[in-house]
Structures are given as C-alpha cells and as structure tokens.
Amino acid sequence: MSARNTKSGNERDPASASRGIALLMALLALTMLTLIALSMAFVSSTEVLINDNNEKRLLQLYAAESACEEARLRIRSLLDLNLVSFTDLNRTVYLVPGSSINPTSGDETTNPYFDPNFDSTLTTSILLSELGSLKFSWTRIWPKTEIRAGYSLDDAVLTTDPVFYGFNKTQSAAKPTQYVNSGTYISSHIGSPVFLVTALAKDPAGFRQAVITDIARIPCPPLQAALFSEGSVQILGSAVFVDGNDQSALSPSSLNGLESQGDIMGDASQIHGSPLAFRFFSSYSYEMASLLKMFRPPVLRDVERLNLNIAKTGAGNYEGTGVMLGALPANGNVSQSVYVDGSLSISNSSGQGILVVNGDLTISGEFTYQGLIITNGKVSLNGTGPGIRILGALLASSVNGSQTSVLDGTINLVYDSLVIRKQFDSLLYTRIAFRDF
C-alpha cells in the first residue's frame, strides 16, 4: 500500500492565511485613511468656522470702535448743548445709526437693541449718528461712576460719585490716574471728569461685540510756581520779573514766583509770589515721563505736522524765527497745542496754547506767549527789545536734574490760572482706557 500525504482538518492552507492577512491589513489601512479624511474634514470645517467667527468679530469690533471714536469727538458739543453734564450725572446720550433703533424701549425680549443698563430715572437724549451706513447698534455716553463701570478704583465699596482723571496735588512726582471725586479727594486732587462710552455692534445673525472706553480731557498738572525748575536757576541782571500772584479775578489761586530743586543764583529782587517769592532746594518734583506720555500726540499736535516756520536740524533738534504758535487774543485768539520731540530754539515769535518740549528750550529776542510751557530739559531765556513776555506758567524738568536754566535780558513772566485753563479747555477729549468684550 502506498503512503498518502494527508493534512489535518485543523491545519490551514498558507496561501489562504496570507490572503486573510492581506485583507485585514487592507481593511485597517482603509479605516485609517477614512479616519484621516474625516479628521482633515473636521479640521477644515473648524478652521472655516474659526475664520468666519474672527471675521465677524473684527467687523463688529471695527464698527464699535468707530462708534466710540465718534462719541469722543462729539462730547464737547454735547456738553455745550447740556445733553451731558459734569454735575448732572443722569444726563445720558445715545447715538444710533437710524431712527428705528431705540435702546430705551421695551426689554431684552421684545427689543434686540435694548440697553439692559437703561434706567427710567435718566434724562436721556437719542441722537442720530454721523457715521452714515456703518453698521453698529448704539453708543451710550454718560459720566463715569464706579457703579456704572462695574469695578472699584480703590478696592472699596462701589460708589455713585463721579470719577475724575488727574493728579494728587499734595504728592510729589504724582502720575495722572483715575479717582473718585468725593471726600478729601476734592481738595487734594486736580483733574477733569471722565465719561464712560459704551458702543454695541450686532449683526443680523446675533453676533455681538461691545467696546467700552474711558474718555476725558487732559488735566493741567499741579503747578507750584510761575516758573518751576528741577535744575538750578541763574538770574542775570535786574530786568527779570517773575510773579506767581494769580492775575485771574475768577477764583484766583496764587503760586510761588520761582521754585527750584537746585539753587537760585543772581538778582531775585524782582521775583514775587505767594506764599513765597522764591524757594530753592525744593523737595517737589514732577514725573516727567508720565507727563510726556500724557501730552504726546495726538493729544497735542506734532510740530512736524504743523505748518510752522520751524526746521529740524541734522542733530534732531528744532529751530525757528518768527514762529506763530497759535494766535494771541488780539490777533485772532487761536489756541495751538504743540509737542516738540527734541530741543527747540526760537526767536522773535509769539503764540497761545500749550507748548511741550522733550528737550532743552531756548528763547531769544522778542517772544510773547499765553499759556503753559513744559520742557524736559533746561531753559535759556534771553529777552531783547520788548523782551520775553509770558502770561501763564513755565515748568522745566531736566532729565538729570543737574542742568542750570538761565534767565537773561528783559523777561516778564506772570502767572494767570484763567489763561492756562482756557488752553486746556480747548483740547479735544482723549481716550484714557479701553476694553472690549
């Protein structure tokens, strides 16, 4: 009997096993490819959704920011019309893009543009926006309080008192800050009221963006003297007249005549003021970096953007003769606020306003000016002919505090608080804080 090759029923054909493994691997690969494709589709759709949401957010953010900017530019006229007020905190203005929008009617269920912060005790005015077809919902303008802002400035109980932006008059090197203008702050601080502006932008699909800005007029820093200098002051001759007695008949508040953190040298017989004619080695100082930041353009106009007879030197300084820094009351009465980012040397010039110089200031010849001059450097005044006549105040705060300012020739510097206040009243309101949500 011949032998046969037989296989057990439990044994597998190697070829069949290979085909099974190949099929399993193919199914696994197909599953992986399917998962990858689904993941890519999910990522792609997510990216589209994110990009779409970002685009909607940016569009609404742009609309809300533009609406806040319109409010900033209109606050002065709203004050003139008594639609908003420094003293009546209930006066509120809404700016709307169309007459069909009324944020004060109905409620959040019946009115998609209803303002949940509206209160029937408010004295409300609804005005049409000047932004034309820009799609936003409304802008609310009212005086700022802690209750309305939703946070405390000093970690205490929220109050309904007005918030101001300004300086602590009693603190040396004080920085501008917001504070509640009540209690002891009324006498210890100097500042201007803050307006809280909220703009809402919402598209038809309900996507919304709100922007809140704090807007105020830049305050005058606390003044200690008609002429204050961080460095020493050298007086040459007897024709230098400085008077800190306030020339304003409206709530006069006199200052020292001349005050210096360093020495005062020379003939001080024509220096007058109250309580002191002059004070040397004063402990008072200014935080010049904060002042420069506060006055920096666009709050003040950049000298290079004004059509003035001032040229920039190769060293980055500025020089001019016959410069008109605004117009005096007798010659047009125009206040001009100028920021010079470098040392300035001018002669035979005149003007009215606020002049801030980030460097040394040199004035020679004839010069007539009404307002406030601030320089981050030493001052050199040399008046000839009728001389240098300044009605207002001058603040010199040199970088290192060791430079000597020189007063020479014919100089007449007299303090007038009303003249200075007039220049600050002419400034546009500016944004001092911003947040969106």
Model-derived features with residue positions:
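Beta-strand/loop motifs with alternating small/hydrophobic and polar/acidic residues, enriched
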Residues: 2-234, 415-437
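Long, acidic/serine-threonine-rich intrinsically disordered regions with weak helical/coil propensity
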Residues: 104, 108-110, 115, 128, ...
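Surface-exposed acidic, glycine-flexible loop patches that form ligand/cofactor-binding
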Residues: 185-190, 346-348, 364-365
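Short, hydrophobic/aromatic-rich segments at coil-to-beta transitions
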Residues: 192-198, 333-337, 371
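Predominantly polar beta-repeat domains that present long G/T/S/D/N-rich surfaces used to bind, process
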Residues: 222-301, 362-437
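Terminal domain-start segments
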Residues: 290-330
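Extracellular beta-sheet-rich ligand-binding/adhesion modules
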Residues: 318, 322, 327, 332-348, ...
